[in-house]
Amino acid sequence: MESLLELQQLSLSLIAKNYNPARITPDFLAASGIIPHDWQLAAKPIATQNAVQLKFKNGLSVSANYRSITFSEGIRTTAIEEMEAAKVATRYLEALPAADYQQVKVSPMCLYNLGDETDTVRQLIVEGLLTPAPWHSFGAEPNKATINLIYELERCQLNLKVDEARFQQGENEAVPGLFFAGDFVYSFAEQSGSEKIGSIKTAISNWQQDVTMFQSQISENIIKTAQAAMSSQPELVSAKALVESV
């Protein structure tokens, strides 16, 4: 089962007061030591008065607005430790430590691939995770649902969104699946100076721990809970069998 849960993207966001997105250019990032000088853009930068987006050929994207800067990276290798997003976010923090940082978000995105079983995707959310009720059969078409969960952890808050999705992999036909988007939100508004910078670095460096927890929470709790609920409803047993056989 767990092999069907695939990490698709990782983003790290630094939230601060009064960012100036106009300063985020390839030349600035390279001159500040935030990215290597030999990194090449994959497309022309998108820049407006209030936002900027840079996409590099190695798969890393940098987007900034007046409140945050985000480093995003699609998963292109099985060696997760080779990812650049956290390294670049740390170097950015070291280059600009005086910004009034308020929060850090570590945001993994996962897809639970279910082949071509579109109906099973819907059932896992509507019948598996939600208590059966008359509203399930309301309307002319099978209803859909998006679930938003908030977890208060010891070190941060985890926001988790569960939704239906269609996943395109290369030139293959798009397949249905469950989409899981998470935000591990670390707050540092009460800290200052070197203490704040140290805490932010620690939060960034623990991103692999967050991703592992995220995947475990999905596999062990959410998906298995949905399967168990489907098993308890006779009309859904065949759908559960489909899920387990994929």
Predicted segments, located by residue:
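Beta-strand elements of well-folded, non-transmembrane domains
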Residues: 16-18, 110-112, 184-188
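Conserved short hydrophobic interaction patches
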Residues: 31-35, 88-99, 207-210, 214-217, ...
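Short, conserved charged micro-motifs
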Residues: 20-26, 80-82, 119, 192-201
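N-terminal low-complexity, intrinsically disordered segments
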Residues: 1-75
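Aromatic/basic-lined ligand-recognition segments
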Residues: 113-183
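Intrinsically disordered, low-complexity regulatory segments enriched in Ser/Thr/Pro
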Residues: 60-79, 165-205, 209
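Long, compositionally biased interface segments
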Residues: 180-246
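Aromatic- and glycine-enriched beta-alpha-beta binding-site module
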Residues: 76-115
